[in-house]
């Protein structure tokens, strides 16, 4: 009888876990289309892939019809294929990120199940991974980090399976997969796909002393396979664009990671708060999980391997000069497996202390955020409120979404932690509603699609369009499906591409703009600008005056010869 009861209990846990995963997938998928694209990242990747699809140039990335060598090609292929199948919409722009997040979740399930032969533990790992805040944000946001993270994850898994396999056939298969994942990772985001796995692997080999010489030889076999994958594209783009290799290696890698003038320069400790906050709603397990993996490192090699995977990547990006929150995404793959294992141990020992701490932390975080937003709207701590007077419905939605976070965690506490998996639904309110309560002052600066739709007819009928912001330029180009936008005053990330002789004419300084206008009196010209603030007088840009203009918050359209 006890055996039947235990079996039924296990089946119920599996069903409940699958139901939770289904809910999580819903709050990944549904918001993809109705949230406006963010500039500069999402509008950039949307436009590069649109132009690639339009021009059928599958080798050289172009942005606004200007060379753009910041990233390799694979991510753009994925986004172009997505746009081909799903059309010209926000869903297709973000689908690649969602898809590769799902691939990583599937890897977690298969890997956990192979290691521990425990279906419930494997499903718990997936639940934790998909509901981690930073994983969710990046998985519903169009950047290349979800894609490169998948290839890094696959590299690390395939090495473990290859190095621990006793069967020669499976060993060879996994070393081949290691080579493939490094190769495709390279044409997704460059040398990072090679550096992260190999640094992690060599440190692991050095510390464990497991067949070092033999394993290094096998890794060189994987490296050869990766070169075979990388070579065709590298050869073609190097043949067509002679300066690509120099720019890609020295500017996009050496300068980005160790150069004094690196992009997104931040201090060493930058990732510590991001790692803790990004781990929500599971941050309460973070330190105990890492500590447990460290304490069992001598007799539990897989847990030490997963811990080392986290530490090496975290330290690598912390040491690098250039930093963005998205870079540490691969750390959350092994972390979610370790957290699931930690929770299983708590349940087996009937210790609910960690579950309690985690739910209390979530309740405190939610309550603090809720109180801060309410008080900020009342007392305007930073000189102005988050929402305008006509946006109180957005404030209500914002408060409600945070209240859902608090309510679910209180339910877990008062139900004696039987339904701890509901923790994964903490962000469900924010996930579904966030796109509906973004303040206007942010929309009309960072999400320009709405403004572009308001002036769409003017832009579409323009003979020439100028913009002083690259993110805004790419948003205009994406919306009106024209890629010949002129860059006004600020070259931004297109500085390198604009240095080419065939693209120099696409940049106009503000002191030359008046003269350019006088030479094109018969043409309809639009100048779209992002202002420093909504009260900034656009005339300070020293552009010719016009009575035909439209402004909303920080975005303004100036019309000439209309």
From Swiss-Prot:
Transmembrane segments: 14-34, 91-111, 120-140, 142-162, 186-206, 215-235, 267-287, 302-322, 324-344, 354-374, 395-415, 425-445
Lipid metabolism keyword on record: yes
Major enzyme class: transferase
Cysteine pairings via disulfide bonds: none
GO biological process: lipid A biosynthetic process; lipopolysaccharide biosynthetic process; protein O-linked glycosylation; response to iron(III) ion
Keywords assigned by UniProt, alphabetized: Cell inner membrane, Cell membrane, Glycosyltransferase, Lipid A biosynthesis, Lipid biosynthesis, Lipid metabolism, Lipopolysaccharide biosynthesis, Membrane, Transferase, Transmembrane, Transmembrane helix
Catalytic reaction(s) noted: 4-amino-4-deoxy-alpha-L-arabinopyranosyl di-trans,octa-cis-undecaprenyl phosphate + lipid IVA = lipid IIA + di-trans,octa-cis-undecaprenyl phosphate
GO annotations of cellular component type: plasma membrane
Membrane topology (UniProt): Multi-pass membrane protein
Pathway participation: Lipopolysaccharide metabolism; 4-amino-4-deoxy-beta-L-arabinose-lipid A biosynthesis
Chief location: membrane
Keyword rRNA processing: no
Molecular function GO terms recorded: 4-amino-4-deoxy-L-arabinose transferase activity; mannosyltransferase activity
Subcellular localization: Cell inner membrane
InterPro entries given in the database record: ArnT_tfrase (IPR022839), Glyco_trans_39/83 (IPR003342), LipidA_mod_glycosyltrf_83 (IPR050297)
Enzyme Commission (EC) number: 2.4.2.43
Database matches in Pfam families: PMT
Family: Belongs to the glycosyltransferase 83 family.
UniProt-listed NCBIfam families: PRK13279.1 (NF009784)
HAMAP family per UniProt: ArnT_transfer
Record function comment: Catalyzes the transfer of the L-Ara4N moiety of the glycolipid undecaprenyl phosphate-alpha-L-Ara4N to lipid A. The modified arabinose is attached to lipid A and is required for resistance to polymyxin and cationic antimicrobial peptides.
Name of protein: Undecaprenyl phosphate-alpha-4-amino-4-deoxy-L-arabinose arabinosyl transferase
Species, as recorded: Wigglesworthia glossinidia brevipalpis
């Amino acid at each position: 009888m006890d055996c039947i009861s235990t079996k039924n209990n296990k089946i119920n846990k599996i069903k409940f876990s699958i139901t939770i995963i289904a809910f999580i997938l819903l709050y990944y998928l549904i918001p993809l289309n109705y949230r406006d694209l963010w500039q500069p990242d999402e509008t950039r990747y949307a436009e590069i892939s649109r132009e690639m699809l339009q021009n059928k140039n599958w080798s050289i990335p172009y942005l606004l019809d200007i060379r753009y060598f910041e990233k390799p090609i694979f991510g753009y292929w994925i986004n172009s294929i997505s746009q081909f199948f799903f059309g010209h919409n926000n869903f297709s722009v973000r689908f690649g990120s969602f898809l590769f997040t799902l691939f990583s979740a599937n890897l977690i399930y298969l890997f956990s199940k192979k290691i521990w032969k425990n279906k419930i533990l494997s499903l718990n790992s997936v639940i934790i991974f998909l509901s981690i805040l930073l994983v969710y944000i990046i998985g519903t946001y169009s950047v290349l980090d979800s894609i490169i993270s998948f290839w890094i994850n696959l590299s690390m898994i395939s090495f473990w399976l290859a190095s621990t396999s006793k069967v020669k056939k499976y060993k060879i298969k996994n070393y081949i997969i290691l080579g493939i994942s490094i190769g495709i990772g390279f044409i997704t985001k460059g040398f990072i796909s090679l550096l992260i796995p190999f640094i992690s692997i060599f440190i692991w080999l050095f510390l464990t002393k497991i067949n070092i010489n033999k394993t290094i030889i096998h890794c060189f076999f994987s490296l050869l396979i990766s070169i075979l994958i990388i070579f065709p594209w590298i050869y073609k783009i190097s043949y067509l664009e002679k300066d690509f290799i120099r720019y890609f290696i020295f500017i996009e890698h050496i300068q980005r990671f160790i150069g004094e003038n690196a992009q997104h320069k931040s201090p060493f400790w930058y990732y510590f708060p991001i790692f803790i906050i990004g781990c929500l709603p599971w941050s309460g397990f973070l330190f105990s999980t890492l500590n447990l993996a460290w304490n069992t490192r001598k007799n539990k090699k897989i847990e030490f391997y997963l811990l080392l995977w986290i530490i090496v990547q975290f330290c690598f990006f912390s040491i690098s000069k250039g930093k963005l929150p998205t870079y540490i995404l691969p750390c959350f793959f092994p972390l979610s497996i370790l957290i699931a294992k930690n929770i299983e141990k708590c349940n087996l020992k009937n210790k609910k202390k960690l579950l309690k701490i985690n739910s209390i932390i979530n309740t405190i975080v939610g309550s603090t955020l809720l109180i801060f937003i309410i008080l900020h709207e009342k007392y305007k701590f930073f000189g102005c409120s988050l929402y305008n007077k006509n946006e109180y419905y957005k404030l209500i939605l914002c408060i409600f979404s945070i209240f859902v976070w608090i309510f679910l965690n209180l339910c877990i506490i008062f139900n004696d932690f039987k339904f701890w998996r509901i923790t994964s639904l903490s962000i469900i309110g924010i996930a579904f509603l966030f796109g509906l309560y973004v303040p206007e002052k942010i929309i009309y600066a960072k999400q320009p699609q709405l403004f572009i739709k308001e002036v769409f007819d003017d832009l579409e009928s323009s003979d020439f369009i100028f913009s002083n912001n690259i993110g805004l330029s790419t948003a205009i180009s994406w919306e009106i499906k024209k890629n010949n936008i002129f860059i006004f005053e600020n070259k931004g990330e297109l500085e390198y591409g604009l240095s080419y002789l065939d693209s120099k004419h696409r940049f106009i300084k503000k002191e030359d703009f008046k003269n350019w206008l006088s030479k094109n009196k018969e043409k309809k010209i639009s100048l779209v600008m992002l202002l420093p603030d909504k009260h900034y007088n656009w005339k300070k840009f020293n552009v010719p005056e016009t009575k035909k203009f439209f402004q909303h918050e920080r975005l303004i359209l100036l019309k000439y010869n209309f």
